[in-house]
Amino acid sequence: MGEGIIQDVERYGVIMFVSFSVGNTGPFKEITGITTLAENLKKEFLEENTFEVSGQNYNKISYIYGANGSGKTNYLAALTKMQKMIIMSTVLGANNNKLLEVPAIKKELAAPIETFKFDIDCKSKETYFEIQVIIEEILYTYSFAIQDGKIQKELLTKKKKRTEVLIKRTSPKYEDIVLRSGLSSFKNMVSVVREDALCLAMAAMLNNPLASMILNEIMNYRVINMASVGNAPDFDEENTNEEAIERYLKYLKIADPTLTNLKVDLESKMDKHVLSEDDLENKELVIKNIHVSVQSLHATYKDHKQVGEIELPFLKYESNGTIRMLRVLPAIFEALDAGSTLFIDEVENGLHPNLVKLLAGLFNSDESNPNHAQLICTTHDTLLLDGVRRDQVWFTDKNQYGETSMCRLSNYPNVRSNDNIAAKYLQGVFGAIPNTQNLQ
């Protein structure tokens, strides 16, 4: 949802996901998150596992470990929520009552931000989101705070040699929004910003180039949940051409050697809704639904010699692991081709550990990843801890009060680069594992 709201902008130069933090929502009472910024003192696997941008190194892959229910999935869900808030800001700013009755929009607007539930004081406090990205070697930091459905604060800064404030908002009212530098052209239109809408989203909607560039990068982030095996792969016209299918088959055949080809049929339905004829220059919200049918072709044999092929419904006859693999492959290759960031929840779900290692390795290889794509994934697979930097690994831990914290492996004392990290993790040295002592 949201195709056509924020203008397409060519992706220039080096683009990098740096960090995402969230506070007072889900299990996150305090502001917490991860960063891909590598620590200068850690030299292990520096060349293989990091990119260098303007003298700083950033990790290609970040792994998030933790017990079930510790907040790993909630962390990725918070990023998705931030993206939806950006889209909903433009929808709300359109002041179009018919648009608000569209089922998908109505459902999203009826799902307010939930504050941390296990501290009664948090209900009356703001929920906070912050994201950092590098575009054309400039670090942009965008944050906002929301309470009772209204934007209380909003801040956008950029930094190359020094930090410059581009947006500073100190209340829900548009009169309390200060715009500078690349956002100055939006000053004469700032009155369209509602109390429940983000200023940066509205500036992008009204064709401010800087706002569009930043939000396009944030909206390009894909979040995949590997547990949703029942869903069809996320296919469209661009990722089902002959070349793309060949790329998928190369890896699918590892799981199913009888597989010879895939047939993908797409049926698209697009609903277009005019946002506003006056204020928003006839911009449209496009809700696109694609029905996907996948047939797999398999070799048939007689006396161990191939004699033909048989066509089978992919989702019915393939294993859960093979289905999950096809579900994630398009997103992986799109990220690698575009140099964008992919977030995967439960990356090992249904896949053999060697396959997970193989797919993750695509992001570490200069040959398959020349465009600086990044992978952020949650996992329980300890085999992935082999050959990683200590600052690539994060642990989520939930305390007795229901509060989730996230801590980098490199922040733990007495952890050396040659330690058996997997063994220490399973022994509970870093926490972030189920507490089974009370059952003994």
What is the predicted role of each segment?
Residues 22, 131-137, 158, 298-305, ...:
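Short acidic, glycine-rich loop/turn motifs
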Residues 135-273:
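Electropositive, glycine-dotted interaction segments
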Residues 4, 10, 23, 231-317, ...:
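Extended helical coiled-coil dimerization/tether regions that scaffold
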Residues 2-90, 302-436:
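Switch/communication elements of ASCE P-loop NTPase nucleotide-binding domains
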Residues 15, 29, 124-126, 137-139, ...:
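Coil-to-beta-strand transition motifs
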Residues 33, 130, 141-143, 284, ...:
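Short, surface-exposed charged micro-motifs
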Residues 55-57, 63, 67, 76-141, ...:
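Conserved P-loop NTP-binding catalytic core
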Residues 17, 140-162, 174-181, 270-297, ...:
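Short, well-ordered strand-loop elements centered on a beta-strand within folded domains, enriched
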